[in-house]
């Protein structure tokens, strides 16, 4: 089982130290998720982390950071995002229905299911899947080690 963590959407004091500690403790995959933020702040956070962890970091948005810091890959948060022209590397994505899951599993290295539950912090972000949806997808073999 791989340990994957998504950052808080906002930056906070000593975030770099906490992330470095998580990597030292065995974190396999960090998703750098800082929507609506200037890329300079993500660059600053990355520059504070030891380079040996860069190949375990997947970036949401600001896709140029993948090449600049030799990160693990990019993540597409929704269907409106596209893979940058000429991009070669690991791609993951978030799907919000079973049809998207079928399609994304064929194209991406791995997929997040979002949202499984109603969000506590974002009241408008409600669950996208019912228990029946998830059980049917599991029976169909759609939910496996490539689905988080």
Label the model's feature ranges.
Residues 1-75, 79-109, 144-145:
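Conserved N-terminal beta1-alpha1 strand-loop-helix module at the mouth
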């Amino acid at each position: 089982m791989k340990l994957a963590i998504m950052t808080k959407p906002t930056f906070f004091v000593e975030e770099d130290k906490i992330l470095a500690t998580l990597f030292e403790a065995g974190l396999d995959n960090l998703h750098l998720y800082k929507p609506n933020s200037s890329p300079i702040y993500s660059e600053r956070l990355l520059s504070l982390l030891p380079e040996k962890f860069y190949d375990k970091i997947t970036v949401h948005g600001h896709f140029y950071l993948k090449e600049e810091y030799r990160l693990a890959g990019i993540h597409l948060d929704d269907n409106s995002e596209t893979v940058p022209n000429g991009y070669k590397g690991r791609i993951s994505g978030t799907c919000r229905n079973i049809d998207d899951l079928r399609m994304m599993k064929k194209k991406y290295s791995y997929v997040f299911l979002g949202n499984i539950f109603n969000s506590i912090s974002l009241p408008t972000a409600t669950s996208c899947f019912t228990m029946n949806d998830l059980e049917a997808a599991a029976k169909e073999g759609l939910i496996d080690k490539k689905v988080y």
